[in-house]
Regions:
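Transmembrane alpha-helix boundary signature
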Residues: 48-58, 76-82, 99-114
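Membrane-embedded alpha-helical core segments of multi-pass
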Residues: 68-69, 90, 94-102, 124-134, ...
Length: 282
């Protein structure tokens, strides 16, 4: 938590006068420029604290390496506004490689009673994590909202993994919660820092993998629970917002990849709710 506060403070001081070519404010109701680099500080604090507290199991390190890569892609998008399809291609590659090499997946084939040598499992798992990443990215549309939602998810995953005696994953969840919590001091309305794509993609990537790993049966890492029902509930808030926004934009002939003020949070604000009340609702 303290590391996150420190790194976010340093980031704020260093980025006050730096305006990237992509201005995330156009997707928010605020006209004031806010640096979108808070996610970098959070990711650095999370990775350092993970290392300091000895959570260096090879699987976690491998996933962490690709989490850094996806954060870099997000940073480049914050700076240079990468085309959505290029970013999507990178997301597919960066998510699929650790899933395949670590042989971890959602056991979707068992759920539907067919066998494709895990090919379908990897496809579904890749889609799931990419969906989570972009849902977290979408819900980062109002001061403090992505922090509140991501923190709630971390807490729920911590309880789930602790219940299943997955204590290392519980520790990782708490460390991620602390990294996000330190950022809240700078993102609570009125925000001084935004997550940016670098942060939302990093957080979404980590949460997505944690959602799969919580079902891990240590005796055989290739076997996972055939259902994601608890996790679907855990991620219901960002997923519902994502699906509502995408469906609405398609229905009016607008590209889902073009940002706007049509999220559930914006609709609540338009009905007269304050930002603090919207955060409480979420």
């Amino acid at each position: 938590l303290l590391l996150s506060i420190l790194f976010n403070w340093i980031t704020l001081q260093r980025s006050k006068n730096f305006v990237p070519s992509k201005n995330k404010n156009e997707e928010r109701l605020s006209s004031k420029y806010v640096p979108p680099f808070g996610g970098i500080a959070c990711s650095i604090a999370f990775l350092i604290s993970t290392r300091l507290l000895g959570q260096t199991e090879s699987n976690f390190l491998y996933i962490g390496f690709f989490a850094v890569i996806i954060s870099i892609i997000g940073l480049l998008d914050d700076l240079y506004n990468i085309k959505w399809y290029i970013k999507f291609i990178f997301q597919v590659i960066i998510v699929y490689i650790p899933l395949y090499n670590l042989n971890i997946f959602i056991n979707f084939e068992s759920l539907i009673g067919i066998e494709f040598n895990n090919s379908l499992n990897y496809i579904v798992s890749t889609i799931w994590i990419i969906l989570i990443m972009n849902a977290i990215n979408f819900i980062d549309n109002m001061d403090g909202l992505a922090v509140v939602v991501s923190s709630a998810i971390c807490i729920q995953i911590a309880f789930l993994t602790n219940y299943l005696n997955q204590y290392k994953l519980t520790d990782i969840s708490i460390l991620l919660l602390c990294a996000i919590g330190g950022f809240l001091f700078f993102n609570f309305p009125p925000a001084k820092l935004y997550f940016g794509d670098s942060g939302s993609l990093f957080i979404g990537f980590c949460l997505g993998f944690m959602s799969i790993l919580y079902n891990w049966i240590p005796e055989n890492i290739t076997i996972y629970s055939s259902t994601l029902n608890p996790i679907l509930l855990v991620f219901s808030v960002p997923l519902i917002d994502f699906l509502v926004v995408v469906t609405y934009r398609i229905s009016i002939g607008k590209s889902p990849t073009i940002g706007g003020t049509d999220h559930i949070s914006h609709r609540l604000l338009a009905k007269g709710f304050s930002e603090e009340k919207v955060l409480t609702i979420f």
